UniProtKB/Swiss-Prot annotation:
Region (Repeat 1): 6-71
Organism of origin: Pseudomonas syringae pv. tomato (strain ATCC BAA-871 / DC3000)
Subcellular location: Cytoplasm
Organism ancestry: Bacteria, Pseudomonadati, Pseudomonadota, Gammaproteobacteria, Pseudomonadales
Residues covered by region (NBD2): 555-763
Protein role: Part of a stress-induced multi-chaperone system, it is involved in the recovery of the cell from heat-induced damage, in cooperation with DnaK, DnaJ and GrpE. Acts before DnaK, in the processing of protein aggregates. Protein binding stimulates the ATPase activity; ATP hydrolysis unfolds the denatured protein aggregates, which probably helps expose new hydrophobic binding sites on the surface of ClpB-bound aggregates, contributing to the solubilization and refolding of denatured protein aggregates by DnaK.
Residues covered by the Clp R domain: 3-146
Residues in coiled coil: 391-523
Chain positions recorded as ATP 2 binding sites: 605-612
Disulfide bonds: none
Protein's name in the database: Chaperone protein ClpB
Alphabetical list of SMART domains matching this protein: AAA, ClpB_D2-small
Region (Repeat 2): 83-146
List of residues binding ATP 1: 206-213
Length: 854
């Protein structure tokens, strides 16, 4: 018998059986070796076949191992083993069976059938399992179908459904799918399309994260529960695993062969299988080589004839990009649009999923956390869809709590580190003999004893709390298992088991859980065992950088005295400071309009009065650094075309991929201060794109992405009307009227009308310049402190600086130049010439109308 007449899988099994014989020091390859190799073969058809007819695989393995152990062994084997007479006889018998069936190649299942001979050792072993040869023959006929074995690779293409699909109905039966809440209209519409005579292939289209795959899972659950029309009862919903279909297809035509075998198996099932293709667009172009067909084209005939019953899922963009371009493929599908659920629907979905996440993370999730997840994700995470983003919030918050439970609490960790530090110090002091060291050692030992007691007490509390949390998690897991069992009993119609579970086991477990929860001690809480609104808000803050979490007492006080803190940097300008502070307080209290920026201001006034400085102070107040400000110098946007730099170049232009300067900055940091400096210098068309930012808090960039400005404070500075401000000093009403007149002349009414507040900055008075001098000199003193130097100026020297630096027209900028000329320049020369050693104190006083240092 020629080896090349065996199928490739059987040849591989024969090769494995040879290795097995060599490894066990057997003189020849016996039928038992081949059967063992066929049984263990990856992707082989023998194991599924044996399971189908009722063989106990583990028992068969043991008996085969015992049979192999009984075979004689040879010493010093050469590794050259041949077939035994029994194996040659077995293969010849399989060859005869192949010829009877008209096969060109001998397949593995015919070897198994030939082995079921009561005269051979292997036959007795197989028949001893209680399965008849006739039953095996029927199973083999079902597996083979009507076709003959004319291809050596035919065994790879068999059971294509098992290899390349995942049975969703089976997973639903086992309770492995998450419950699908709501989405009744979409599931009903999908069923409606599936019931059609032709083109009965729905495709679920929606944004990423709206729950397209969940609808397919919901359909599987309805099929299992019998909640579908008669036409769909008993059908199986299989999900196509595109990765498995493509993976390992090395040679040209191998992918097409796999897909063809899959389609053949589906057609044999006579409409009993619905194929779910997630990410349907991947089928278009999949497996396409030079001149070969792609998967999409191979599906078309099967879809048109109704042989392939299919449910697809893809996003709107990919449907437009791939499916719509292929009109012949598109017409074979019926669109089912899946919209983003509302906040109320999302809350219902989360309530349905709550138990699954509680069991997985072993923590409780409060209803407040669910409502907060839906509301906060909808408001602050604008670039993703509900319910996906809300589910992610719950998942991450629960994961965070679980991590805290599993690791040591921060208080204990700090105490442990402190104890180690003190013990190291005590060890070092034991070597010292002087009086001071002995006293210090006594103190340290007292401290160590005190801390060890505190640590032991806290550790005891932590251990008991951890045990409580673990206990409730175990009860919750039992409740979940009982509910799954209840569902299975309902499907079987086992009323006794249903009654036992519904009215006995589950209520008892729920009572136990309630008792455990009530027993929990509220004081000394080291562990958080519940996910509440606060944890959800913390996760949102981490994701977006927007402070959503509950304000600490310190932050409340800070916000209430915001004006005082801003005045540490900005001298005077009471109206501007109050306006900005009120905007920030409104935003943090949650009272600002959710569809507009937190605040939008136009700062008007002469140069050097603190317009830009107030923005820097605001950024420092909010983010502890003035660098957290998005600063755009509008003088760079004088040309009409420069508006593209803000939102990104249009498609086809250089720089399209880079995105816009303003939009990208806000996408990365949605909570920021945006300063549009010298706004009147920009081209008038630039203000057109700011209209929707100021009104709706949103801007669409060149890629079509909507950027959210609702958590930003927008400040525009301008020198418009500065001449009128100088002329009308003291008369606030006349000043405002004159300035607003200048603003109305330069800007369009629809732009000015959208700004929350136009703030007019007063020219600086002499006493305000004195305050600014203190701030500027304070910064210089900081720089000197880095060189270990201190500086003191006499009152006369300060007066001299103020007199030189005060200019009502130019504001505080001349003061900066005065400090540079009178203080910094002479100091730099003295320091470089070695006039001051580190640790020196520098005194400045006026001598002959000059400031002299000594």
């Amino acid at each position: 018998m020629r080896i090349d007449r065996l199928t490739s899988k059987l040849q591989l099994a024969l090769s494995d059986s040879q290795s097995l014989a060599v490894g066990l020091d057997h003189p020849a390859i016996e039928p038992a070796h081949l059967m063992q190799a066929l049984l263990e073969q990856q992707g082989g058809s023998i194991k599924p076949l044996l399971l189908q007819v009722g063989f106990d695989i583990n028992s068969l393995r043991k008996e085969l191992s015992a049979e192999l152990d009984r075979l004689p062994k040879i010493q010093n084997p050469t590794g050259d083993v041949n077939m035994s007479q029994d194996l040659a006889r077995l293969l010849n018998q399989a060859d005869r069976l192949a010829q009877q069936k008209g096969d060109q190649f001998i397949s593995s299942e015919l070897v198994l059938l030939a082995a079921m001979d009561e005269n051979s050792k292997l036959g007795k072993l197989l028949l001893g399992q209680g399965v008849s040869k006739k039953a095996l023959e029927n199973a083999i006929n079902n597996l083979r179908g009507e076709g003959a074995v004319n291809d050596p690779n035919i065994e790879e293409s068999r059971q294509a459904l098992d290899k390349y699909t995942v049975d969703l109905t089976k997973r639903a039966e086992e309770g492995k799918l998450d419950p699908v809440i709501g989405r009744d209209d979409e599931i009903r519409r999908t069923i409606q399309v599936l019931q059609r005579r032709t083109k009965n292939n729905p495709v679920l289209i929606g944004e990423p994260g709206v729950g397209k795959t969940a609808i397919a899972e919901g359909l599987a659950q309805r099929i299992i529960n019998g909640e579908v029309p008669d036409g769909l009862r008993g059908k199986r919903l299989l999900s196509l695993d595109m990765g498995a279909l493509i993976a390992g297809a090395k040679y040209r035509g191998e992918f097409e062969e796999r897909l063809k075998s899959l389609l053949n198996e589906l057609s044999k099932q006579e409409g009993q299988i619905i194929l779910f293709i997630d990410e349907l667009h991947t089928m278009v172009g999949a497996g396409k080589g030079e001149g070969s067909m792609d998967a999409g084209n191979m599906l078309k005939p099967a879809l048109a004839r109704g042989e392939l019953h299919c449910v697809g899922a893809t996003t709107l963009n990919e449907y437009r990009q791939y499916i719509e371009k292929d009109a012949a493929l598109e017409r074979r599908f019926q669109k089912v649009l899946v919209d983003e659920p509302s906040e109320e629907d999302t809350i219902a979905i989360l309530r349905g999923l709550k138990e699954r996440y509680e069991v997985h993370h072993k923590v409780a999730i409060t209803d407040g956390a669910i409502i907060a997840a839906a509301k906060l994700s909808h408001r602050y995470i604008t670039d993703r869809q509900l319910p996906d983003k809300a589910i992610d919030l719950i998942d991450e918050a629960a994961s965070r709590i679980r991590m805290e439970i599993d690791s040591k609490p921060e208080v204990l960790d700090r105490l442990e580190r402190r104890l180690i530090q003190l013990k190291v110090e005590a060890q070092a002091l034991k070597k010292e003999k002087d009086e001071a060291a002995i006293k210090r050692l006594e103190k340290l030992q007292e401290e160590i004893v005190r801390l060890e007691k505190e640590y032991a007490d806290l550790e005891e509390i932590w251990t008991s709390e951890k045990a409580e949390v673990t206990g409730s998690a175990q009860i919750q897991q039992k409740i979940e298992q009982s509910r799954q069992e209840l569902e299975a009993a309902r499907r079987r119609g086992d009323l006794n088991r249903m009654a036992e579970l519904q009215y006995g086991i589950i209520p008892d477990l729920e009572r136990s859980l309630q008792m455990v929860d009530q027993h929990g001690k509220p004081e000394n809480q080291l562990l958080r065992s519940k996910v509440t609104e606060e944890e959800i808000a913390e996760v949102v803050s981490k994701w977006t950088g927007i402070p959503v979490s509950k304000m600490l007492e310190g932050e409340r006080e800070k916000l209430l005295r915001m004006e005082t803190l801003l005045h540490n940097r900005v001298i005077g300008q009471e109206e501007a400071v109050v306006a900005v502070s009120n905007a920030v307080r409104r935003s943090r209290a949650g009272l600002s309009d959710p569809n507009r920026p937190s605040g939008s201001f136009m700062f008007l006034g002469p140069t050097g009065v603190g317009k830009t400085e107030l923005c820097k102070a605001l950024a420092e107040f909010l983010f502890d650094t003035e660098e957290a400000m998005v600063r755009i110098d509008m003088s760079e946007f004088m040309e009409k075309h420069s508006v593209a730099r803000l939102i990104g170049a249009p498609p086809g232009y250089v720089g399209y991929e880079e995105g816009g300067y303003l939009t990208e900055a806000v996408r990365r940091k949605p909570y920021s201060v945006i300063l549009l400096d010298e706004v009147e210098k920009a081209h008038s068309d630039v203000f057109n794109i700011l209209l929707q930012v100021l009104e709706d808090g949103r801007l669409t960039d060149s890629h079509g992405r909507t950027v959210d400005f609702r958590n930003t404070v927008i400040v525009m500075t301008s020198n418009l009307g500065s001449a009128q401000i100088q002329e009308l000093v003291g008369d606030r009403e006349a000043q405002r009227a004159a300035v607003m007149d200048a603003v109305s002349t330069h800007f369009r009414p629809e732009f000015v009308n959208r700004i929350d507040e136009v703030v007019i900055f007063e020219p600086l008075a002499r006493d305000q310049i004195a305050g600014i001098t203190d701030i500027q000199l304070g910064r210089l003193r900081k720089r000197l402190a880095e060189r270990e130097l201190t500086m003191v100026l006499s009152p006369e020297a300060l007066d001299k600086l103020i007199a030189v630096g005060y200019d009502p027209v130019y504001g505080a900028r001349p003061l900066k130049r005065a400090i540079q000329r009178w203080i910094e320049n002479p100091l730099a020369q003295l320091i470089l010439s070695g006039g001051f050693e580190p640790g020196s104190s520098i005194t400045g006083k006026v001598v002959d109308d000059e400031i002299v240092f000594g």
